[in-house]
């Protein structure tokens, strides 16, 4: 390991607030931005930060995620001294069971972590959209001689009650942690990104299990326990773009923010690329009747209608007379002749029949995976 740090991505979340989009796949496997899945951002951050050993902890509906990650080659994680490992719940003689929380998922994978023997473990969520240099966070952790470092981002005070809030002294040492406080004292919100000194965390988790102490969740149990025991716990203050895409509205917003030559994620930054599994598709075909404005259009698309301020993923068809506006269309979608789609997310493989109207002007509308709306035209 280049920097002595193992990354563990928590990717087992169901994401119930995404409704139809997570009925058959885990939230980190949901598509984003035309050619990515949400987990690609955490994996790419690891690759760009020089972290070459990554464990991906799955649980709910893992098949699509497992197929997407494979051996990690798309992120350069398939070398001799590197690897991406899928970690799923299993039954052992000690009675291991389904993960009961974030830190319990780490406890159940102690054998894997010990086989890597890292000095530090980086805990990540697989369902956020952002770019971060984890090595810079590690250097801050070392400089503070911290036992635990928590990445935080400033949020508006009116929104702070939705997050775990860190109250710090003038040196960024955390003196108090409040989970979703009614009257927040700070605007430093936890991003769910942690660096732990592994041996200290390991000891805590093992002792808690032996003594039947609930230490299953980082926010509810581990961080408060660290603070109570006087551990050196600091924040890492992140200033870049970060989006929790846990709701339909936030997922739609993040995709709309991704459109444009100078988007918040700076998608054309060659020094910090976002990698993904490559899918071979033919070139786009845009007919002479088509009209495409201010949109991202990925390979394999066929457009004979109008597309405005939208994202078309791989192999999307927009047939004659159809109009798509302010929408995110996932891969392999067919939009029939004369259909009208506004402020919507259309799931993979969906079919929108001729002259169907999907109007999200009040609330963002969602069509699920392989869902058929209206009567499809077989031509």
UniProtKB/Swiss-Prot annotation:
Pathway: Glycan biosynthesis; glycogen biosynthesis. SUPFAM superfamilies: Nucleotide-diphospho-sugar transferases (SSF53448), Trimeric LpxA-like enzymes (SSF51161). Its EC number is 2.7.7.27. CDD domains: ADP_Glucose_PP, LbH_G1P_AT_C. It is an enzyme of class 2 (transferase). GO terms for molecular function: ATP binding; glucose-1-phosphate adenylyltransferase activity. Pfam families: Hexapep_GlmU, NTP_transferase. GO terms for biological process: glycogen biosynthetic process. It comes from the Bacteria. The keyword Nucleotidyltransferase applies. Gene3D superfamilies: Hexapeptide repeat proteins, Spore Coat Polysaccharide Biosynthesis Protein SpsA, Chain A. Alpha-D-glucose 1-phosphate binds at residues 164, 179-180, 190. Disulfide bonds: none annotated. Keywords: ATP-binding, Carbohydrate metabolism, Glycogen biosynthesis, Glycogen metabolism, Nucleotide-binding, Nucleotidyltransferase, Transferase. It catalyses: alpha-D-glucose 1-phosphate + ATP + H(+) = ADP-alpha-D-glucose + diphosphate. Involved in the biosynthesis of ADP-glucose, a building block required for the elongation reactions to produce glycogen. Catalyzes the reaction between ATP and alpha-D-glucose 1-phosphate (G1P) to produce pyrophosphate and ADP-Glc. Belongs to the bacterial/plant glucose-1-phosphate adenylyltransferase family. Homotetramer. PANTHER family: GLUCOSE-1-PHOSPHATE ADENYLYLTRANSFERASE, GLUCOSE-1-PHOSPHATE ADENYLYLTRANSFERASE-RELATED. This is Glucose-1-phosphate adenylyltransferase. The gene is glgC.
